[in-house]
């Protein structure tokens, strides 16, 4: 099942379709926060259990400035699964790529891109995965759109809590570097 949501401070446009046995979601959303702040929030995997629905625990195995490997335990109703992923961090481009290492999936990848926008930050988020278990895959497919929407909303709510509700609109002058001629 594939879901695409395009949203800018309003009701999202949602498109869903089946793509083999993989579950896919893509979303672009404008959030009134700085791209650097949102990048830092998503890169801070260790804190996911504090605010992310169904994330019960997070353990960082290894980390440096540009990558980390982490174990996450996710749980929903009677399901509880642990998986490991590698997270590639690109702070210069404000991009995060997540690759699956081990756990209950056949395949898992997701990406985040944080782009400057006149209203704050445009987030480009993509995830696709397939579980090894057909039972787990069928359960997730019925709940998938709502689950991903809640997860993305949890990041936005966390950003509001950490960085303030919604900063004032960023003007074009604030977004551009200011250059002044030397006084002579």
Where are the language model's segments positioned?
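Hydrophobic ligand-binding cavity/cleft-lining segments
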Residues: 2-66, 119, 165, 179-184
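Hydrophobic-ligand binding "helix-grip"
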Residues: 49-53, 57-66, 73-124, 128-130, ...
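Generic recognition of short, well-ordered alpha-helical segments
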Residues: 43, 109, 138-139
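A conserved amphipathic terminal alpha-helix motif
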Residues: 131, 135-179, 183
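Short beta->alpha junction loops/turns
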Residues: 44, 101-103, 141
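Short alpha-helical basic/polar micro-motif
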Residues: 36, 112, 153
């Amino acid at each position: 099942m594939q879901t695409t949501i395009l949203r800018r401070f309003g009701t999202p446009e949602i498109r869903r379709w089946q793509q083999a046995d993989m579950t896919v979601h893509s979303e672009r959303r404008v959030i009134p926060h700085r791209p650097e702040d949102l990048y830092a929030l998503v890169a801070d995997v260790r804190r996911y259990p504090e605010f992310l629905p169904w994330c019960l625990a997070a353990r960082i195995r290894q980390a440096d400035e540009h990558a980390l490997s982490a174990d996450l335990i996710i749980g929903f109703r009677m399901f509880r699964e642990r998986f490991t992923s590698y997270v590639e961090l690109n702070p210069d481009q404000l991009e995060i790529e997540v690759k699956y290492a081990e756990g209950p999936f056949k395949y898992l990848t997701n990406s985040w891109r944080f782009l400057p926008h006149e209203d704050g930050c445009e987030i480009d988020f993509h995830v696709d995965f397939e579980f090894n278990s057909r039972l787990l895959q069928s359960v997730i497919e019925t709940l998938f759109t709502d689950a991903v929407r809640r997860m993305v909303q949890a990041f936005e709510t966390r950003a509001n809590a950490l960085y303030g509700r919604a900063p004032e609109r960023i003007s074009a002058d604030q977004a551009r570097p200011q250059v002044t001629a030397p006084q002579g």
